[in-house]
């Protein structure tokens, strides 16, 4: 009788574990096709939508003269990467589109990134080499996020979201990349989503 009870408990535990694993399936919240692009990163390398395909990537909008949300957003992205590194997750990239491309040359972007403790700089692509009007239109068409030059200052208004793009160039998730309370930035969720996506699709 005791053996039967023990086997029943073991079976119930196994079913519970398998159910939990089944719930881990990646679920896309969006299906937004990213527009083609080909730009220059902080290392002077050409980066295109096609060159990024095959791996998922995390994207955001920043600029180096930003005096408000960009520094904490960039820091938050380094925290995401730190947790990915600890988990041994390697099959991804990080892409930051400059929303002030006339100021943000590759050299300026490279210097900007040195202000942060970046676990793996090789996965970061800070992009520039296009016009202000281009990035304003691109942001709306590809990510449904606002980018708008402020004519009364040297600042640029832009979305504070991080976005997850799948291996085929489709935006599938968005997250708050900035919050007044840093604990409200869903770093663990981003890491979990990316890990689940990679496990199921690569």
List where the protein language model places each region.
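Bacterial N-terminal signal peptides that target proteins for export
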Residues: 1-8
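C-terminal motif of bacterial Sec signal peptides marking the signal peptidase cleavage site
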Residues: 16-20
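N-terminal "domain-start" segment that seeds a small globular fold
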Residues: 23-51, 72-76
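Short loop/turn microsegments at loop-to-beta-strand junctions
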Residues: 34-35, 56-57, 159-161
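Short active-site neighborhood of thiol/selenol oxidoreductases, capturing the structured segment around
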Residues: 48-71, 77
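Structural microenvironment flanking redox-active thiols in thiol-disulfide oxidoreductases
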Residues: 75-138
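Structural micro-motif
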Residues: 124, 136, 143-148, 156-163
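Thiol-/selenol-based redox modules, centered on thioredoxin-like
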Residues: 150-202
